Amino acid sequence: MTTFFNKLFTGASSSSSAAASSGMDLGSMESLCAAINELCSEKHVSENVGELAAGIVRKNKELFEKKSNDVEAFLLHCSPNVGSAAMVAAIKGMFDTSAAKNNETGTDRAVELLNHYVDENNFVGGHLKLVPEIIFPLLRDVGLYCLEKKNKPEIGQRIIMKALGSMFPRNGSNAPNVLTSAHGVLFACALETKDYASVEPFIDLHVDEIANENCIQDQEKSDNRERDFGDVFLGRMKKGAAFGSQPVAHNPHLHPKYVLDYLYNGACILIELKRFEDALFLLEICVGMPAFSVQDQHLDSFKKYVLISLILKGKVDVTENGDKSAIRHFKTKSPEYKQFSEIRFSRSSNTHSAVESLVKSAKDRLRKDGNTEIAKYLVVEMKKKTIMSLTRMFTSIRISEIEELAFLKSRDQVTELIGQLVEEQRITVRIDGDMVFWTELSPVPSKNDVENKIRIVDHLNTLLHEKNTTMKAGSGRMRPSVMYNEDEGLSMPPTESKFFS
Amino acid sequence: MQNELLDDPMDTGAPAAEAAAADEPLPPAHGIDREVTPKPAGNPDLMQQSLDNPAIPMHLIEKRDDRRESCDDGYSLTVNESAIDIESLACSYDSNAFFLRARFIARHCPILRADAYISLINYLKEHTTDITHYVAFFNELESELARKEFKNRQLNFQIPLRDQKWIEENGATWQSTTDQLQAEYKRHKDEGVKESTRRAMEDLFQHYMMAGKIDEAIRLYSRGIRDYCTQLKHSINMWINWMEVAICANDWGKLDTVTNTAYRSLKDADDAEKNSQQSQQAPPQRGENAPYMVERDPNAPIQTLTNRQLIETALAKCLAAQVLLKLRNKRYSQVVETILQIKTECLQSKWFVTSSDLGIYGMLSAMATMSRADLKLQVSGNGTFRKLLESEPQLIELLGSYTSSRFGRCFEIMRSVKPRLLLDPFISRNVDELFEKIRQKCVLQYLQPYSTIKMATMAEAVGMSSAELQLSLLELIEQKHVSLKIDQNEGIVRILDERDENAILKRVNVTCDRATQKAKSLLWKTTLAGANIHSISDKETRPKRKNQKESAKFDRNFGGIDVDEDPRGIAGPSGLSDDFNIAYDQQPQQQVQYLEDLGDI
C-alpha cells in the first residue's frame, strides 16, 4: 500500500525516517501517547476509554499542530483500540499544518497515512464519532484535496466511504442517519468518478441528526471566556459565566453550505441513478431552504428541480417550494427555466413538441448548467407521457390514430416508443393487424400495503408532534443571527495543558 | 402647435417626460393629419395636390388605419356566409356602435364586405367629419369591387361616388376649428373657471370624436376631466363618454379602469340620491354625504326623476361595459351575474350592446358554465332573461332543447347561429370555446345513465360524427370530467367505476404517499432547526436590495396619487395644478404687500 501511494503521490517521503535520523526530541508526543495507552489498563472501564481519549485529545489539540513532525512516531506507538481519536487528530494536525505551509509533501503523506489506517480498519468507528469536530472536517478536507488538488477523486471517495462506513455501519442496523460535512464531498467525488452505486447507501432521504462539528470548540471558547472574565472581574464571575454560556446553545452544528452540498450533490447522484422521485425530494428541500442571499447551488437546485418535476409530474408545483419570493428570484435569474416551469403537460396541447422546441432554443444554457442529458431525457419522457395518456383512454386503438393523437412524426416513432414502454414494464401491448390492444401496468396496492402506509403516516405525525414539542421547550424558538467559525478553532492561542500540569 | 398647447406642464401639471412618453405614438398620426389636413386652410390647391398624390397620403392613411385595427389584425377570422343584414344592423345600432360592428364585418366577412363599406361610407358622410376613414374605406371598397370574384356578385346598396368636395371642405375647416377649440380650452383653463373649462373640453372631445380621432379624444380625457365636473349630470356624461371612447379604441385596459372607477362613483351617487329621496321632507343640503348633489327646489319632481334616470342609465351602461370586459377575459360565470344586475330598461336601445345582445351573451355563458338545475332556475325560469331573449326565438329554442336533452336539435341550432355570432365583435373570439363547453356538457349528460354505450349510437343521438365525438370524449377525460375508456375495436365506450375497490385503494395509497412526503419534508426542517441551522447564508452577507429604493420612490409617488383617479396619476397633478396656479397667482400679491409693508417702515 505504501508503494502504491508513493507512485500516486510523487515526492512523498517518510518524515519519520527523517525525524529519527535527525534525533529530534519526542518527549511531548511520547508522553501523550503513553497517557492514552494507559487507558487500556484495568483501572479504566472499557466503555469509557473512548470518551477519555477524546477528552485528552481536545485538551492537547495544539500539540498535534506544533509537533506535526512527530505524528508518524505517535501513530506507530499509539494503540488504535483506545487512541483512534488521537490518531485522527494527529493526522489532521499534520494535514492542516502542511496545507497551511503549502507543503504538498506533508499533505500527501497525511492522506497516505489516513488511507492506510482506514483501509486496514485500524480505527474504532465508535471512538471517531466522539470527536466530530476533528474527524469530519478531516475527511472533508482530504476529500476536497484529492478532488481538486490532486485530481484523484477516487482516492478521496474511498477514504471517506471507509471511514463513514466504520462510524455508521449500513448492515441493517438501527443507527440514526447522520448528516456530516464529509457526505457532500463524498458525493462530489462520486460525481467525478461516476461511481454512483457505491455511494448510494450513504444518501439518506430522512436525516435524524446533523453532526455537531462546531459545538466542542464553542464550549472550549466559552470555558476560556469564563476564565478570562474570572481573572479580570473577580467579583463578577457569575455574570461573566452567564454571559459566556449564552452563545453555546444557538451556534449551528454545521455550516449550512455543507447541508446544501449534501442535498444538491446527493440529488445529482440520484438523478444519475434514475431515482427521480428521491432526487426531487432532496431538490425540493434544497430549494425551500431559506437564505438571505441566493447561492449558486441554490439556483442550480431550482433548475434541476424544474426539469425533474416535469419528468415525473409533467408540471412544476412551484407553490409548494416555500418562499414565493425566492421562486420569483430564481425565475428572474434563469428565464429559460422560467419557461420550463410554466409548462403543464397536456396531450391535446402537444406538450412534447413545445418542450422539444424549448430544449432546442435553450440548449446553450442547458449545456452550461450541465443539464443537457436531463433535458434530452425530458423530451423523450414527454413523448412517453403522451402515449401513456392514450393507454388510459383507449383499450384498443388503431396505430394510425396513435400517431395522429400523439402528434408523432412517423409510425416508426410510435412503435419505438411503445417498445420502450413495454421494456420499462409500464404497459402491455398486443398487436392484431392494424389494431393495438394495450393496458397500463399500474400495480394495485393491497390492503396490507395501504394499512402499513397509514401506520407510517401516523408514526411520522407522532414524531412531528414530539419534535415540535421539543423545539418549543428548547432553544428552537430563539433564532439569533447565525455565526460561523470558519477556522474550526484550530487557530486558538496555545495554552498550557491541564494534563501536563 | 396643438401638442405644445395641450402638453404645457404649467397647464396640466403632468411631468414633461411623461408627456413626451405619452406623445410617442403621435408622430405617425400627426404626420397623417398634416398630410391629409394641411394648415393653410385657405389654400385648396395644396389640399388638392396632396389628394392628387395618392402614394404618400394613402399609404399613411392605410398605415394609420392598420395601427388602429391592431387588435383585429391579430384575429384571423373569415366568415363565408351572409349571416347578418347590414341594413338591419344600421337600424339596430347607432353612431359608433354601428361603425364598430360594420367595420368588423367588413374585415371578416368577404361576402358582406362591399355592403359594409358602402354603409360605412354613407354613415361617415352623413354624421361625421372623419375624412380619414372615409378615404380609407373608399379605397377598400374600390379594391373589393375590382376583384375578380366580385364580378358576379350583387350589391344591396348603391355604390356611392367619392365626394371630393366634402373631403376638401372638411379638411380645410377641421384644423382651424381644432385650433380655435384648443385656444378656447386653454383660455378657460387659464382663467380657472371650471364650468367653462369643462364645456370647452367637451366641445374639443366631440370634435375629435366626429373626426374619428379616438386617440386624441382619449388623451384629452386623461388630462383631468374629472376635476372640471362639478355637477352630477356632467360626471355621468363624462363617464359615459369615457367608456364609449375606450370601447371604440379597443382599449380594454382603459375600459377596465374606467368602468371600475365609474361604478364606484355612480354607486355613491345612487346612494346619495336614495338618501336624498328618503329625507325629502327636509330640503337636501350640499355636503360630504352628497358630493354629486346640487341644491334644487324640492317641489321639482321632474328634476329628481331626471337625476334618477341619469344615474340608472349610466349604471346600466357601466355594467354592460363590464359584461364586455368579462366576456373578453373569459369569465363566463361572472358574465351571467353581471347581466342579471343590469336594468336593461335603462339601457340605451341602440348602444354598443342591446338587450338582445346581452341576452345572447348571458344565455351562452350560462349554458357553458351552469348546471342544468341552476340554468333552469336562473335563466329559463328568469323573467329578465326571457325578456332579453324575446326577440331571439331561435336561441330560446336552443335553450329549451338543451334543458330538454334534445341534443341533436341543440347542436343543429348552434351550427345555424354560429356565423352570426362570429360576426359580433364582442363575442366572436369566445364562440368556439363556448360552443365546445356546451357540447361537452351535452355529452356528459348523455353518458350519465350508461355504463357501456356504442359510439355509433351516441354519435347519432348527439348529432356528431364519430371522429368529433371521440375528440369530445378525449377532452372530457383529460379535463377529468369523466372516467371512461374507448374500445375502437368493438366501437364502444366503457364508463369506469370510480367507486371500485381497486380505485379506492389506489387513491388512498396516493394520499398516504403525499402525506408521507410532506411529513418527511417537515422532519427535515425540524432537524435543521434542531441543529440551529435556520438559513443558508448569513444576514450580513445579504446584498443591498434594489427594491428599497423603489419602495421609497413608491412612497413618495403614492402620496401624490388619488386612488380613484387614472392609474397613470395624471389627474392627480392636474388636480393639484389648480391649487398651485391659484397659490402661484397669489404669491406675487403677497410679495407686493410685503414690499409695501417694508416701504412704510
Swiss-Prot record, chain A:
User: What GO biological process, any one, is recorded here?
Assistant: mitotic cytokinesis
**Superkingdom of the organism of origin:** Eukaryota
Question: What keywords is this UniProt entry annotated with?
Answer: Cytoplasm, Developmental protein, Differentiation, Nucleus, Oogenesis, Signalosome
Q: Where in the cell is it found?
A: Cytoplasm; Nucleus
Q: What Pfam family is a match for this entry?
A: PCI
Write down any Gene Ontology CC term: COP9 signalosome
Q: What region holds the PCI domain?
A: 275-445
Function noted in UniProt: Component of the COP9 signalosome complex (CSN), a complex involved in various cellular and developmental processes. The CSN complex is an essential regulator of the ubiquitin (Ubl) conjugation pathway by mediating the deneddylation of the cullin subunits of the SCF-type E3 ligase complexes, leading to decrease the Ubl ligase activity of SCF. The CSN complex plays an essential role in embryogenesis and oogenesis and is required to regulate microtubule stability in the early embryo. Mediates mei-3/katanin targeting for degradation at the meiosis to mitosis transition via deneddylation of cul-3.
Q: Which family does it belong to?
A: Belongs to the CSN3 family.
Report quaternary structure and partners.
Component of the CSN complex, probably composed of csn-1, csn-2, csn-3, csn-4, csn-5, csn-6 and csn-7. Within the complex it probably interacts directly with csn-2 and csn-4. May interact with itself.
Q: What is this protein called?
A: COP9 signalosome complex subunit 3
Organism field? Caenorhabditis elegans
Swiss-Prot record, chain B:
Print the keywords alphabetically.
Cytoplasm, Developmental protein, Differentiation, Nucleus, Oogenesis, Signalosome
SUPFAM superfamilies, A to Z: Winged helix' DNA-binding domain (SSF46785)
Q: Name one GO biological process term.
A: oogenesis
Organism of derivation: Caenorhabditis elegans
Which proteins does it associate with, and in what oligomeric form? Component of the CSN complex, probably composed of csn-1, csn-2, csn-3, csn-4, csn-5, csn-6 and csn-7. Within the complex it probably interacts directly with csn-2, csn-4 and csn-5. May interact with itself. Interacts with rbx-1.
The entry's localization annotation reads: Cytoplasm; Nucleus
Which Gene Ontology terms of cellular component type are present? COP9 signalosome; cytoplasm; nucleus
Q: Does the keyword Cytoplasm apply?
A: yes
Region annotation (Disordered) maps to: 1-54, 268-294, 535-581
According to its UniProt record, which protein family does this protein belong to?
A: Belongs to the CSN1 family.
Question: Which first-to-last residue range defines the signal peptide?
Answer: none
Start and end residues of each PCI domain: 338-500
Q: Would I find Cytoplasm among this entry's keywords?
A: yes
Function comment: Essential component of the COP9 signalosome complex (CSN), a complex involved in various cellular and developmental processes. The CSN complex is an essential regulator of the ubiquitin (Ubl) conjugation pathway by mediating the deneddylation of the cullin subunits of the SCF-type E3 ligase complexes, leading to decrease the Ubl ligase activity of SCF. The CSN complex plays an essential role in embryogenesis and oogenesis and is required to regulate microtubule stability in the early embryo.
PANTHER family according to UniProt? 26S PROTESOME SUBUNIT 6 (PTHR14145), COP9 SIGNALOSOME COMPLEX SUBUNIT 1 (PTHR14145:SF2)
Instruction: Name the major location.
Output: cytoplasm
Q: Where is the composition biased (Low complexity)?
A: 14-24
SMART domains, alphabetically? PINT
Transmembrane regions listed in the UniProt entry = none
Concerning InterPro entries, the annotation shows:
PCI_dom, Rpn7/CSN1, Rpn7_N, WH_DNA-bd_sf
Q: Output compositional bias ranges, type Acidic residues.
A: 1-10
Q: Name the chain's protein.
A: COP9 signalosome complex subunit 1
